[in-house]
UniProtKB/Swiss-Prot annotation:
Species annotation: Dictyostelium discoideum (Social amoeba)
Binding residues annotated for Ca(2+) 2, in chain numbering: D59, D61, D63, K65, E70
Binding-site residues, Ca(2+) 1: D23, N25, D27, Q29, E34
Binding site for Ca(2+) 3: D136, D138, D140, C142, E147
Keywords (A to Z) from UniProt: Calcium, Metal-binding, Repeat
Protein's name according to its UniProt entry: Calcium-binding protein 4b
GO molecular function: calcium ion binding
SMART domains the record matches: EFh
Listed InterPro entries: EF-hand-dom_pair, EF_Hand_1_Ca_BS, EF_hand_dom
Domain EF-hand stretches: 10-45, 46-81, 85-120, 123-158
GO CC, any one term: extracellular matrix
Recorded superkingdom: Eukaryota
């Protein structure tokens, strides 16, 4: 599992490399022109709009340049948005098992979901047992969206640890 320190070191290194690649005047910051040129080089659709949007959101001190910290913030925000979108999709897919729509998955609902998804009865029981063993953190015989979300964060190592 990646630690926060390792994650931030990797983020800083990646940010420095990205800035270095686009920084034409060597000031360790990105101007609107440098960002716009980078988008054009990558054949990004509507580079001017993308550049203006990026600066509007992340040029925090409004000096017309993106610093290392501002770029790190942009990358981190993009990462969090993507991670949260993936988490929501994952939870929504699994919660198709919630047949009575009470925002809880029971063992029987999980078993039935696995059968509907192509497992035979024996496989479905094993999968439901495994799911409850891994995800039902409070042992109340139901899986909530929050339990599933927390499980996914840990299992898929979505966010760095301490």
């Amino acid at each position: 599992m990646v630690t926060k320190k390792e994650f931030l070191e990797e983020l800083t290194n990646a940010t420095n490399e990205a800035i270095k690649a686009a920084d034409k005047n060597g000031d360790n910051q990105l101007s609107k022109k440098e960002v716009n040129d980078m988008y054009k080089k990558c054949k990004y659709p509507n580079p001017t709009l993308a550049t203006n949007s990026l600066f509007e959101l992340f040029d925090l001190d409004k000096d017309g340049k993106l610093s290392v910290n501002e770029v790190k913030t942009a990358v981190l925000v993009d990462y969090i948005i993507e991670a949260e979108t993936c988490l929501k999709k994952f939870v929504d897919i699994i919660f198709k098992a919630d047949s009575n729509k009470d925002n809880k998955i029971t063992w029987d609902e999980a078993r039935q979901y696995f059968i509907t998804s192509g497992s035979n009865e024996a496989q479905a029981k094993v999968l439901a047992n495994s799911m409850f063993e891994d995800v039902d953190s409070d042992d109340d015989k139901c899986i909530t969206r929050e339990e599933l979300r927390e499980y996914a964060i840990e299992y898929f190592e979505i966010y760095p640890t301490e």
